[in-house]
């Protein structure tokens, strides 16, 4: 049995999702989003770090899995997204958790079968797999998608995705 925390980093909203993985079964433990809009950027990074650290301390995951930063036409946005990702990852580093990172295309390919799938398709698949209400936010479903992807990869090492 392993607890996996998935993170969808963002400089305004960071999603998180925690699942319990046992061989071929998954159970949703907790998920949500950290909303950061009203704070200056440095304060947002601190909030991400503290919130993720507290979540990790509470649920004691074996794996920390984060969605890879993708290239954007706006260098400033990429830099801020990278810093948000680092703030979350630093919490895992400081707590000695195994860290993995997956590209969005790989997550979509594994969950939906199409690396170019739309966010709504991913959300619907996540809700189906975990028996969740479709009212969860996109950031939350993306974070759960990262965690589910890791579950599939560690339990199907012999398969090529």
Swiss-Prot record:
Coiled-coil regions listed: none
Keyword Secreted in record: no
Bridged cysteine pairs (disulfide): none
Active-site residues from the entry: 8, 67, 139
A family per Pfam: RuvC
Transmembrane stretches, start-end: none
GO biological process: DNA recombination; DNA repair
Chief place where the protein resides: cytoplasm
InterPro entries the UniProt entry points to: RNaseH-like_sf, RNaseH_sf, X-over_junc_endoDNase_Mg_BS, X-over_junc_endoDNase_RuvC
UniProt key word Magnesium: yes
GO molecular function terms listed in the Swiss-Prot or TrEMBL record: crossover junction DNA endonuclease activity; DNA binding; magnesium ion binding
UniProt-annotated location(s): Cytoplasm
Reaction catalysis annotation: Endonucleolytic cleavage at a junction such as a reciprocal single-stranded crossover between two homologous DNA duplexes (Holliday junction)
Binding positions for Mg(2+) 2 per the UniProt entry: 67
Enzyme Commission number(s) from the entry: 3.1.21.10
Keyword annotations: Cytoplasm, DNA damage, DNA recombination, DNA repair, DNA-binding, Endonuclease, Hydrolase, Magnesium, Metal-binding, Nuclease
Stored HAMAP family: RuvC
Subunit structure: Homodimer which binds Holliday junction (HJ) DNA. The HJ becomes 2-fold symmetrical on binding to RuvC with unstacked arms; it has a different conformation from HJ DNA in complex with RuvA. In the full resolvosome a probable DNA-RuvA(4)-RuvB(12)-RuvC(2) complex forms which resolves the HJ.
Function according to Swiss-Prot or TrEMBL: The RuvA-RuvB-RuvC complex processes Holliday junction (HJ) DNA during genetic recombination and DNA repair. Endonuclease that resolves HJ intermediates. Cleaves cruciform DNA by making single-stranded nicks across the HJ at symmetrical positions within the homologous arms, yielding a 5'-phosphate and a 3'-hydroxyl group; requires a central core of homology in the junction. The consensus cleavage sequence is 5'-(A/T)TT(C/G)-3'. Cleavage occurs on the 3'-side of the TT dinucleotide at the point of strand exchange.
Name by which UniProt lists this protein: Crossover junction endodeoxyribonuclease RuvC
Lineage: Bacteria, Pseudomonadati, Pseudomonadota, Gammaproteobacteria, Enterobacterales
């Amino acid at each position: 049995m392993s607890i996996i925390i998935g993170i969808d980093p963002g400089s305004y909203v960071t999603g998180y999702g925690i699942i319990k993985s046992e061989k071929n079964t998954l159970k949703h433990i907790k998920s949500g989003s950290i909303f950061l809009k009203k704070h200056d950027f440095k304060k947002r990074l601190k909030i991400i770090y503290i919130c993720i650290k507290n979540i990790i301390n509470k649920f004691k995951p074996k794996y920390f899995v984060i969605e890879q930063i993708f290239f954007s036409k706006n260098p400033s946005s990429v830099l801020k997204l990278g810093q948000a990702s680092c703030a979350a990852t630093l919490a895992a580093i400081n707590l000695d958790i195994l860290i993995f990172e997956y590209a969005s295309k790989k997550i979509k390919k594994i969950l939906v079968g199409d690396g170019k799938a739309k966010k709504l398709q991913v959300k619907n698949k996540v809700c189906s797999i975990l028996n969740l209400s479709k009212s969860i936010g996109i950031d939350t479903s993306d974070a759960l998608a990262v965690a589910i992807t890791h579950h599939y990869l560690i339990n199907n090492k012999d398969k090529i995705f």
